[in-house]
């Protein structure tokens, strides 16, 4: 491996094991057993070793490797290694044999069988993959969804895939959503918009926005999301609903004036008792121009909430069209200066400098004069105020 990069010194290193090599590693056995136990299958040298074993075994290779794969008495990692060898070195198992492997007691073997069906799609394998969506193991269900995405063998009935959206395994829910996005939208649009399970509805509507990001669709999703937020939702689901609104607003290029009811609803929620909610609420409020949160946002800046959360809120305030009075403008600028001076991150200090400069565009002439008089204390604000001075600058 190597180190260095980006103008730093580095080097090339090799790691060598100097301990005693276990007997099971030194003695891999002979014949097909050595091929099954061969370490580092993905390396070139390991594949060369296996290719040599295959040449030695000749016509017996296929039967011996298949025997390892299909025997329930073998450990699952031996069986899946045998399936890998059949894929890499042949003979590739027939569709019937792969379907038989998909019914094995071992979850690992069933998942590997689903992987192989994704590589070699056929009519029977498509039906079997749809059946395996109801497997009792999440790893198998994930492998099935990935195989469907790879091969295009999608289910025709959305009800086969929708329950997986609510699974606790986030990776499974993700790949299931990707499968749903590939299916014809007209088959599942109404189901996700009206689904009783909020989790299925949230992820289903995210799939809908990705599959059909039209303005009409995004407005429907925003309307349904607004309804969901009036019902009981867990904190995690509420946060995801807010994020769904952000995606819908962005993908549909929705003008804030089209969703004034959502704007007012978001404004009423801020500040929430959960910091994750506040992160999403302040972003939405800034985009939707929810000026009614201005006073509460200023109170939030002076609260005892974590500084990163307050800084995010302060950085979003610059996007509000609220007509700040002089006292409020100075309070916001004071926070920018304080956060920039207190942070140990040079990057954040530079971000806050840019935010101060942008916010300074709203300063009045009186504000500019007052800030420049205190330039030694309010350095970033003074720099922003300079941009407001008339050109050329006179001595006064």
Model-derived segments and spans:
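Long, ordered, helix-rich scaffold segments
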Residues: 2-11, 15-396
